[in-house]
Amino acid sequence: MESTEKLTDTNAILAYLYETFPLCFIAEGETKPLKIGLFQDLAERLADDSKVSKTQLRVALRRYTSSWRYLKCVKAGAQRVNLDGEPCGELEQEHIDHAQAMLKESQDKAKAKRAALAPKPAAKKAPKKVAVPQRAKTERPAKPAPKAAAPVVNYVQAQLTDLTKKQRVNVKLGMTPVAGVITDINKEDIHVQLDSGLTIKVRAEHILL
């Protein structure tokens, strides 16, 4: 009897996608940009698969498309691919610029984190001074200038009546809002194409202006 146990760990779901769609999801080495709207294709292809849920698939797909390995592949001349690895058109410059900005931001954060965790070198002992008639004045080291605070972006909760097609918005996904464009509004369901190429369906309460 086939096991119906659901996969809940994101790494396990990614491993399942690598195995099931090896021409689309690349486990090692250089990846390929994914087709816009691939999540819908993935959900339909796995609709009868009891191992994964749409929620977990969305989390795994977001982890895959926000990795450094994936963001580096979003570059000029690269072709998007579908679940079977078939070409689906070249990348738009807007998506390339957004991916490179996300990559730089992520790398800068990682660099700052490594610097904060690095052990500080031990202070060297100053050599003994030769006695002089007058006491030598020691200059106090200048205090470092305070770091400028990061700009605070004040988002506004969107109302359904405020939203229109082709409007740029921010979608609440995790800790950081993700930018995208509204592609369709169906009653209370708003379809948003994120700048990473992923298309999702959310309610107005998840959209920020």
Curated annotation (Swiss-Prot):
Record family assignment: Belongs to the ProQ family.
Taxonomic classification: Bacteria, Pseudomonadati, Pseudomonadota, Gammaproteobacteria, Alteromonadales
Gene Ontology process terms (BP): post-transcriptional regulation of gene expression
Protein name stated in the entry: RNA chaperone ProQ
GO MF term list: RNA strand annealing activity; RNA strand-exchange activity
NCBIfam families assigned to the protein according to its UniProt record, in alphabetical order: PRK04950.1
Sequence segments annotated as region (Disordered): 105-148
Localization, UniProt: Cytoplasm
UniProt entry keywords in alphabetical sequence: Chaperone, Cytoplasm, RNA-binding
GO cellular component, one term: cytosol
InterPro entries recorded: ProQ, ProQ/FinO, ProQ/FinO_sf, ProQ_C
Pfam families assigned to the protein according to its UniProt record, in alphabetical order: ProQ, ProQ_C
Protein role: RNA chaperone with significant RNA binding, RNA strand exchange and RNA duplexing activities.
